[in-house]
Amino acid sequence: MITVIAGLRERDRCARIQTRHISNSNDCASTPGIGTRSLACRAILDNRNVTGTVSAAQPQLVIFDLDGTLTDSADGIVSSFRHALGQIGAAVPGGDLASQIVGPPMHHTFEAMGLGEHAEAAIAAYRADYTTRGWAINSLFDGIGPLLADLRAAGVRLAVATSKAEPTAQRILSHFGLNDHFEVVAGASVDGTRAAKADVLAHALAQLQPLPERVLMVGDRRHDVEGAAAHGIDAVVVGWGYGQGDFADTGASSGAVHVATIAELRRALGV
């Protein structure tokens, strides 16, 4: 089931609409954002129940996250992360490393570990190892290739926005033969000045002008949802990535559509 949880930039407005059970467009016609209505309000415009299964109008532009959304990259990232900490003599954190480190900008992760003056050395060691071997310890999630091909065939514009360094993201997509599907591949700058998801999305959107009415972000983590919301874009969260813990609290997933399988993602995207 694809569940819409009304929230973020229109939480109060859509909650009021749901409470009154309004089935017309009056309260949703002027929804702010990049020329698009929220999925919750769009469901109301189509006389659908926003708390049930929703098949939204097909988006005209879909922006995908990379790690945990298109590719299963955790093993390579974790391996290079362990290597980097070993190089500076730091202990590896316990717990599920994939859920802790895959997705957010890596230099933010190292800085948050309290490595002090060794943080830069750890980042350099990580990048050296990842760009040499870690990037290739990677695979496409099942069904991604055909999904992208079908979206393109339907006339949907496609892009990637990832907190991974942009040259590495381009290399990975080229390795899997996916580069031609994407109009824009936007990633973090190598110097780290552009790394937060909202900033990477801004970089992508600037290259995608003029933007169509219906724009959608597809990712696996909370920062994908929050980065999209910063630009007035709705989000779909895939359940096969590394961010399940991000959404344990219902409030963290507000405003997003959650899908568990490629088949559900296809329904959400109209293909």
Language model feature labels by segment:
Residues 86-88, 109-116, 137, 145, ...:
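Substrate-recognition/cap helix-loop segment adjacent to the acidic, metal-dependent catalytic center
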Residues 15, 22, 27-29:
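Short hydrophobic alpha-helical segments enriched in small aliphatic residues
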Residues 217-257:
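Acidic, Mg2+-coordinating phosphoryl-transfer loop and its flanking beta/alpha structural elements
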Residues 26-30, 34-64:
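Non-catalytic pre-domain segments flanking phosphatase-related domains
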Residues 177-185, 247-269:
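Structural recognition of alpha->loop->beta junctions
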Residues 51, 56-146, 150, 154, ...:
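N-terminal helical cap/lid subdomain that shapes the substrate entry/recognition surface
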